[in-house]
From Swiss-Prot:
Top-level taxon in the UniProt lineage: Bacteria
UniProt subunit comment: Homodimer.
Predominant subcellular localization, coarse grouping: cytoplasm
Keyword terms of this UniProt record: Cytoplasm, Metal-binding, NAD, NADP, Oxidoreductase, Pyridoxine biosynthesis
Cofactor(s) recorded in Swiss-Prot or TrEMBL: a divalent metal cation
GO CC annotations, alphabetized: cytoplasm
Residues reported to bind substrate: 140-141, 279, 288, 297
Name of the protein in its database record: 4-hydroxythreonine-4-phosphate dehydrogenase
Length: 338
């Protein structure tokens, strides 16, 4: 299978550090990196952080992913999308760092769409740095949707330790907009696409899907909102003969009682409804997967952590798990179409 592309993220955050630690750990544990990666970003930034971390990784610049095969397993190949014009300043917001992080994503996505890379794993970007660079996007998900000309990709979060998976019906939007988006979205298509992705990407033959309500107590029969009765429940009923889907459940009791363990995936109506319990349960190991794209993309479920950038304190566990999952999903898709 082809190589995976790891994007460097914001060069003033922990992205370069967790990439280097993941690569170094893989070399020390197996003698070779399992995912056979290339890094898309800045060779200078990787060399800078490698020195700060006291690592002796052999970093080489290449101009095409196919050239990575010519190097020994211990070499970390890098495709540069640009180099910083001034000394690196870990923990600071920079338009240049934002621009380089987005250029890396664009390059990796294009390599995947061209069939030259099997998957992409993205290190964290900083939203303010991206905005300063002139990009209107709020994160990876909507940027990749534009690059892939795809409508409404799904954010899914997975904990490889417990198996917990949470999908979001809406993503990075202000809370006051959630009800209108729930009413305007094609919820039936959302659930059908989610079901299909779980089958193809995770090899779950009959996914068990739990759906949370939007309102407190799932509105208690319409006392605290009408979205459950008018939108969510009719959609679940219409799909029940084709999918293993149940709900809507009150979010607090659902997670508090551990009922989520009875399902393959839980669908939350908005960002914090799903991510708050997920991060409590899987802060160090959680992975973000973007479903509904014509490419495989995973990422660690954390941000740039500017407060510890460049200090050698960042945990690479989530990125390492994201790299493993990207390889697994790419393999599953390859087998499905072989």
């Amino acid at each position: 299978m082809k190589t995976t592309a790891w994007t460097i993220g914001d060069i003033h955050g922990i992205g370069p550090e967790i990439i280097l630690k993941t690569f170094d750990e893989s070399l020390r544990s197996t003698g070779q990196p399992e995912e056979k990666p290339i890094v898309i970003g800045s060779a200078e930034a990787l060399l800078y952080y490698s020195k700060r971390l006291g690592l002796s990784i052999d970093i080489r610049t290449i101009d095409a992913p196919e050239k990575a095969a010519a190097y020994p397993q211990g070499v970390l190949p890098v495709i540069s999308v640009g180099e910083p014009s001034s000394p690196l300043q870990p923990g600071t917001i920079s338009a240049e760092a934002g621009r380089l992080s987005m250029l890396a994503i664009e390059k990796a996505a294009n390599l995947c769409l061209e069939g030259r890379c099997a998957a992409m794993v993205t290190a964290p970007i900083h939203k303010e740095a991206v905005a300063r660079a002139g990009y209107p996007h709020t994160g990876h998900t909507d940027f990749l949707a534009d690059l892939c000309a795809t409508d409404n990709p799904t954010m899914l979060f997975r904990d490889p330790v417990s198996g917990l998976m949470v999908a979001l019906a809406t993503i990075h939007v202000a809370l006051h907009r959630v009800p209108e988006l729930i009413r305007s979205m094609d919820m039936s298509a959302f659930f059908s696409n989610l079901n299909r992705s779980l089958q193809s990407d995770f090899r779950i033959e009959q996914p068990r899907i739990a759906v949370l309500g939007l309102n407190p107590h799932a509105s208690d029969g319409g006392v605290m909102g009408r979205e459950e009765k008018e939108i969510i429940l009719p959609c679940i009923d219409a799909l029940a003969d084709r999918q293993n889907i149940e709900g809507p459940f009150a979010a607090d009791g659902f997670f508090g009682s551990g009922k989520y363990r009875n399902y393959d995936v839980t669908v939350a109506m908005y960002h914090d409804q799903g991510l708050l319990p997920f991060k409590v349960l899987a802060f160090d190991t959680g992975i973000n997967v973007t479903l509904g794209l014509p490419l495989v993309r995973t990422s660690p479920d954390h941000g740039t952590s500017f407060d510890i950038a460049g200090q050698g304190r960042a945990s690479h566990r989530s990125f390492s798990e994201a790299a493993k999952l990207a390889w697994e999903i790419a393999f599953n898709r390859l087998m499905e179409h072989s």
